[in-house]
């Protein structure tokens, strides 16, 4: 069965990279190859290097990209290893970098992966299925304080203490639907009627399992060092906490180093642009509604 995944903010992301036919481009979250395939179509003598810690994504994108060309390399790795992995290819600078921080549709839709709170499966949520830490371990062994911390820090979960307490009391919890019911049991009916709390709690557990925020911060530093002059780093985010990491990192780079009242003209090193999905894209793909594309371009 073919895995359907619609790349989000595709046109805006590709345009922002200003692709040169002989350039070197990175897709640090190759996924199902939606964005990567459009990059590869524009490369004549250039090279696309794609990263993903999900081996299934690597295999699926390879099939898709092979139909377009052969000038690509796929690396099964977390993007926080990007500099080391590129060094193995003797690459120390690139012409553009794309990062899509969203979880892909096939990952959500495949019940066995344990990401979905509406489909029953063993608690898993690992992007890299070779790693030991999974959602089952987090849910069944973390202390109440540890659970409260990840719920609040990674998803701003309302009633985080009550949810953590409910999880502790109902252990062992083995499946996604069991966890969903436990989460709901911590909320009064009035709050449940307004919003399903499972989305935020599952998000927090997924971020913990995959060490996502730490990886993002490491990746940002490495990506910045890899950019050539006049090249761009384009990052698509899907929730406010994730986006705030990117916004803060980019903001610090473009912020003036001098007091505002000092009449010193600074040479701009970077510019930042922000894009949101069009109404048309949102109507065609509801998953795009919370997406945001931030693009940092290195000027000197």
Curated annotation (Swiss-Prot):
GO terms for molecular function: rRNA (cytosine-N4-)-methyltransferase activity. Keywords: Cytoplasm, Methyltransferase, rRNA processing, S-adenosyl-L-methionine, Transferase. S-adenosyl-L-methionine binds at residues 33-35, 52, 79, 100, 107. One of its GO terms (biological process) is rRNA base methylation. Gene3D superfamilies: Putative methyltransferase TM0872, insert domain, Vaccinia Virus protein VP39. It is found in: Cytoplasm. SUPFAM superfamilies: Putative methyltransferase TM0872, insert domain, S-adenosyl-L-methionine-dependent methyltransferases. GO terms for cellular component: cytoplasm. Its EC number is 2.1.1.199. It catalyses: cytidine(1402) in 16S rRNA + S-adenosyl-L-methionine = N(4)-methylcytidine(1402) in 16S rRNA + S-adenosyl-L-homocysteine + H(+). Pfam families: Methyltransf_5. It comes from the Bacteria. The keyword Nucleotide-binding does not apply. The keyword Metal-binding does not apply. It is an enzyme of class 2 (transferase). Specifically methylates the N4 position of cytidine in position 1402 (C1402) of 16S rRNA. Belongs to the methyltransferase superfamily. RsmH family. This is Ribosomal RNA small subunit methyltransferase H. It comes from Mycoplasmopsis agalactiae (strain NCTC 10123 / CIP 59.7 / PG2) (Mycoplasma agalactiae). The gene is rsmH.
């Amino acid at each position: 069965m073919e895995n359907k995944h619609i790349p989000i903010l595709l046109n805006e992301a590709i345009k922002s990279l200003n692709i040169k036919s002989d350039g070197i481009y990175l897709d640090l979250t190759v996924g199902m190859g939606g964005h990567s395939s459009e990059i590869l179509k524009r490369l004549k003598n250039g090279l696309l290097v794609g990263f993903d810690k999900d081996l299934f994504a690597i295999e699926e994108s390879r099939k898709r990209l092979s139909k377009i060309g052969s000038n690509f390399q796929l690396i099964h790795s977390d993007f926080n290893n990007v500099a080391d992995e590129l060094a193995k290819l003797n690459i120390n600078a690139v012409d553009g970098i794309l990062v899509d921080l969203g979880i892909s549709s096939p990952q959500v839709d495949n019940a066995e992966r344990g990401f979905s709170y509406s489909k029953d499966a063993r608690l898993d949520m690992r992007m890299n299925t070779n790693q030991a830490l999974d959602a089952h371990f987090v849910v069944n062994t973390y202390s109440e304080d540890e659970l409260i911390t990840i719920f609040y820090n990674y998803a701003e979960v309302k009633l985080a203490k009550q949810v953590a307490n409910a999880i502790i009391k109902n252990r062992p919890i083995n499946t996604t639907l069991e966890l969903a019911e436990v989460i709901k049991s911590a909320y009064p009916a009035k709050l449940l009627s307004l919003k399903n709390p499972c989305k935020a709690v599952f998000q927090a557990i997924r971020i913990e399992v995959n060490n996502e925020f730490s990886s993002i911060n490491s990746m940002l530093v490495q990506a910045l060092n890899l950019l050539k002059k006049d090249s761009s780093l384009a990052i698509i985010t899907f929730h406010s906490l994730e986006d705030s990491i990117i916004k803060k990192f980019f903001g610090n780079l473009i912020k003036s180093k001098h007091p505002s009242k000092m009449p010193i003209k600074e040479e701009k090193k970077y510019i930042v642009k922000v894009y949101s999905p069009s109404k048309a894209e949102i109507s065609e793909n509801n998953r795009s509604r919370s997406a945001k594309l931030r693009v940092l371009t290195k000027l000197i």
